């Protein structure tokens, strides 16, 4: 038996998101007249998807959109999301069934799976936070519109800065990640012999699982069944 399906969305409901997923299954079995049979099955679901980020009510008001997503921006005129998840866990199982007699059966299986999970995040080093909804980029960081008693952040200059920040946020390009500017900043840093100021960090969580199991089933009476089994397994994880 074989089955393959594919699902995708170049643009999700939330702007800047996408989804790609393939799933497959393959199974085969061989039976012999002497009571033995062998079967093999394998399956997997490689997936790539981008994420949506939550923000503050101030940001949603500025963007006039409660579906605002701060995780994406334009690079060379194309949308790029900074939070992308790649997930793939291919698995396979090999099974030997032996009908010893009319009352007794032995089933032995070897199972293996290698799961790979990676998630990315935009990070920075000795530079300004590149996230567009970082609190220092918001109008509220210049002027306190709520607390009339706070004279520190209610000066004429603070109000002018607040208006400037509001107008800056009204531009859609400004409220998304500035990928081209980040690359330009890295090129300038490299020209001065410095390390990259901005980079995409990837976190990996990989696991290998191997299991060998065997079970013996026998009828010892009209309404009695005896079962005994053995299972040996190992799991190896890598996180970096």
Which residues make up each language-model segment?
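Flexible, surface-exposed loop regions and adjacent strand-edge segments
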Residues: 18-23, 54-69, 123-133, 138
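Short sequence motifs at beta-strands and strand-loop junctions characteristic
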Residues: 16-20, 75-76, 80-88, 200-208
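Short C-terminal domain-edge/linker segments immediately following a structured domain
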Residues: 7, 31-38, 59-60, 69-77, ...
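Face-selective signature of the C-terminal outer-membrane beta-barrel domain
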Residues: 87-240
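Glycine-centered flexibility motif
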Residues: 9-12, 45, 73, 79, ...
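Internal, well-ordered domain-core segments that constitute the primary functional module
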Residues: 27, 45-76, 80-84, 92, ...
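Transmembrane beta-barrel wall of Gram-negative outer-membrane proteins
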Residues: 1-9, 13-52, 90-100
